[in-house]
Amino acid sequence: MGAVPHQITDHDRPADDTRRRLLTGVGVTERRLELAAIPTAVLEGGHGPPLVLLHSSGEFAALWQRVVPDLAATHTVVAPDLPGHGASAAPPGPLGADGMLAWLGELLEQTCPEPPVLVGRGLGGAVAARFAAGHGDRVLGLVLVGAFGLAPFDPAPAFGQAMQRFAEEPTADTRDGLFRQCFVDLDGLAGQLGERWAAVADYALDRARTPAMGAALEGLVPELVLPAIPPAELDRITVPTSLIWGLQDLQVRLAVAEAASARHGWPLQVIDRAGDDPPMEQPAAFLAALRAALAGTR
């Protein structure tokens, strides 16, 4: 338990350089914790009530970079790389839903002196929802952003094809093909971010080629990406819960969020000109939506 050293290999060094480019100016510190026997990279910044940001599958915590500085002005932000993602190690064995919930529980034990609000995108949303359903006393609130688990995984056909091509052969071309399904205006986003976007793209491709990510997703996809969380389990979520969705999300389409909102009474805020990553694509609108959701947890 606690902080652990990170073994740097020759293969890691180019990725570490790219990671430094990603995090420059974001205003976070990085430390390594051992969580459920998994060495985990955790970004932290700010002061105030704890806010835990959980990214999606095939991603990394630095993708929250456009909203972390604003959130850190009022909250203690905790953004881990999920197991096998980013700079976090692969799990020592098959990692399914139970293992992820144990991992998240240890993250909260080591980083949050009081119950946090969990904000989860995609896979991170499915993990956060299941944790809130089973451990409501350890969570102040829940915000689901394009989350998996509210219905069986059924992306738009073009999205699914691009995702499959990238998974089978991660190259710059297949990466950009997938990114064009993820974002409404990829060229505009790249232009806004400049060199920082180059670091995002380089790091995403490098991490997709690592055995660690494949090992993690092998267990996570069947249990936390593809299936719907049973409605009775979602009914056990008692903490204030909100939904934030991109209007043009092709991965988990808006109808999924609308159905969950109607069934559970969860407020839904929709962000225009955003696909499955509103905090990256429309940070100002996402921050406004998130602050409205956070106000409901007080």
Identify the role of each PLM range.
Residues 236, 240-274, 280:
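Conserved loop-alpha-helix segment in the C-terminal half of the alpha/beta-hydrolase fold
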